[in-house]
């Protein structure tokens, strides 16, 4: 079971996918938006290739937690995507995900041109990782004492 995370923008959709254990998120691609039909087809291809069973879509809330027009558009897209893919689509607070993604890329000394190419998928990765961390059962935390250091 893999989960796909999405950062929905007006021009692009950042896409990330979890590992098979649901522990980590990896940025996969950025979909250039052309039409709803093409967007859904591109996301269906990624979902099929990675055996996605659940989708987490970033919900762009205002800093005070209220919803604006972008949040309403995300809700509508989530409904359409759920019907198109036949999977559950869950909305997840995406506040500051792009800021965190930009900061991470700057700290990694990624060039401006490369940042433009990957910023949306890194933001999707932050959204998905936040969701994965929040939904991880408490007994799956890693404790070094639980493992032998000897081979």
Curated annotation (Swiss-Prot):
PANTHER family referenced in this protein's UniProt entry, alphabetically: POLYNUCLEOTIDYL TRANSFERASE, RIBONUCLEASE H-LIKE SUPERFAMILY PROTEIN
Gene3D superfamilies: YqgF/RNase H-like domain
Principal EC category: hydrolase
Keyword tags: Cytoplasm, Hydrolase, Nuclease, Ribosome biogenesis
Species assigned in the record: Myxococcus xanthus (strain DK1622)
Described purpose of this protein according to its UniProt entry: Could be a nuclease involved in processing of the 5'-end of pre-16S rRNA.
GO biological process entries: rRNA 5'-end processing
EC number in record: 3.1.-.-
Name assigned to this protein: Putative pre-16S rRNA nuclease
Origin superkingdom: Bacteria
